[in-house]
Amino acid sequence: MPLLDSFTVDHTRMEAPAVRVAKTMNTPHGDAITVFDLRFCVPNKEVMPERGIHTLEHLFAGFMRNHLNGNGVEIIDISPMGCRTGFYMSLIGTPDEQRVADAWKAAMEDVLKVQDQNQIPELNVYQCGTYQMHSLQEAQDIARSILEREVRINSNEELALPKEKLQELHI
């Protein structure tokens, strides 16, 4: 099985919260696509609660679009990581990490402004696969934890696992 890019970086050295360019590629028409790792939690030490990450998923995508789309950037998708330590964001364009970090912080401020669970988009049986698994309070706790800390930049070069280590791990 091919080794995915996300498994070639050393998760024991990742900082959080932090932005990392996880992958860049071009479409057949030459459009740049960038995938960002938005790491909310230190891997293997912190994890977002399932109700909070689910609510954040509903809020974060719209708020990030409000703050990041434009000037050659259009978000395709923002999805939570299965490990519940962050989100992957795929977009058209190549914004730098600081622009992404600034938009992320602004989006977290927006999460804190939501006053009632009824304001969560698509929170109904028709548009959400587990519409009862939400917590605005947990989502706002996550947002506060991001805003209380500096959003850093994780570098692929600094986090790259040496080839010897990958071989040792039988990858």
Curated annotation (Swiss-Prot):
User: EC?
Assistant: 4.4.1.21
Q: Name one GO molecular function term.
A: S-ribosylhomocysteine lyase activity
Q: Name one Pfam family in it.
A: LuxS
Q: Which cofactor does it need?
A: Fe cation
Q: How is the cofactor bound?
A: Binds 1 Fe cation per subunit.
Q: What class of enzyme is it?
A: lyase
What is the catalytic activity of this protein? S-(5-deoxy-D-ribos-5-yl)-L-homocysteine = (S)-4,5-dihydroxypentane-2,3-dione + L-homocysteine
Q: Which residues are involved in binding Fe cation? A: 54, 58, 128
InterPro entries attached to this UniProt entry: LuxS_sf (IPR037005), Metalloenz_LuxS/M16 (IPR011249), S-ribosylhomocysteinase (IPR003815)
Output the GO biological process annotations, alphabetical, semicolon-separated: quorum sensing
Check the record and name the HAMAP family matching this protein. LuxS
- Quaternary arrangement and interactors, per the entry? Homodimer.
Q: What does this protein do?
A: Involved in the synthesis of autoinducer 2 (AI-2) which is secreted by bacteria and is used to communicate both the cell density and the metabolic potential of the environment. The regulation of gene expression in response to changes in cell density is called quorum sensing. Catalyzes the transformation of S-ribosylhomocysteine (RHC) to homocysteine (HC) and 4,5-dihydroxy-2,3-pentadione (DPD).
Xref: NCBIfam families: PRK02260.1-2
Q: Which PANTHER family match?
A: S-RIBOSYLHOMOCYSTEINE LYASE
Name the family the entry cites: Belongs to the LuxS family.
The protein here is known as S-ribosylhomocysteine lyase
Gene source species? Shigella flexneri
